[in-house]
Amino acid sequence: MVYAVYSLNKLISVGLVEKRLCITEEKNRKKTQYILKDQMFRFWYAFVPAAASSVEMGRGAVYYEKVVKPQLHNFMGKVFEEMCRYYTLREGIDGNLNCFVTEVGTWWGTETVEDVSGQKKIQSADVDIVGLAPSEKTMVVGECQFKNAKAGRDVLETLVRRSRAIPSKYRVVQYLLFSKDGFTQWYTDEAPGDVAVFSLDDLYKEGVGH
C-alpha cells in the first residue's frame, strides 16, 4: 500500500497523473479522482496495448478503422472539456466573464429529481466546469457538449438544475455553454443575459492552449 502511494505520488510529480478534487468539496476525501494528465498517454493506454498483435501482423490500419476510429469521438470529448476549462480560467482572469474567476474545476455528486410520475429520485450528476471567484464569493458554471448536433435549450436547463446541487457559499452569476457544433436558434433569440455560448471555432480563434 505504501509503495502504491509512493508510485502514485511520483507519477503526479512528473506530470503524468493528476489528483483531481471535487471543487467546493476539497475536504471530502471520498471525492478524489486520479486521472492521466497527458493526453498522449491517455490515448496510448486506451488503444495501443490491445493493438499490438494487429500492428505486428501489419494490420494496424485495419485496427484503427475497426476499433480506434469508432471510439475517437468519445475520447476527444474529454480533451474538449480540458480546453473549455482552460478557456474559462483565462477568460475569467482577463476580465471577460461576469466575475474574476481564478480557480476552475469540476464538480460531481448527486441531485434529486422528479420522474414522470412525480416521484422523487436521487441520481448522479456532474458539472463540467465550475469557475470560482473567491474574492467576490461568486462563480460561473459550464457544460461542454462534444456532439455532432447543435446544443438546444435543454442543455442549459440541465446545467441550471445541476448547479443547484453544488454545496457552495458561492453565488452563480453566469452560465457558460460550449458546443462543438454550435447552438440552436433559441440561444440567439431567447437566451437570458447571464448565458454565454462558445463553439469549437470560438476556442480555436482565441488560441486555446497558447
Enumerate the predicted regions with their spans.
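Short amphipathic alpha-helical interaction segments
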Residues: 1-15
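A short, conserved structural fragment
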Residues: 12-24
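A cross-kingdom feature that marks ATP-driven nucleic-acid transaction machinery
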Residues: 22-23, 27-210
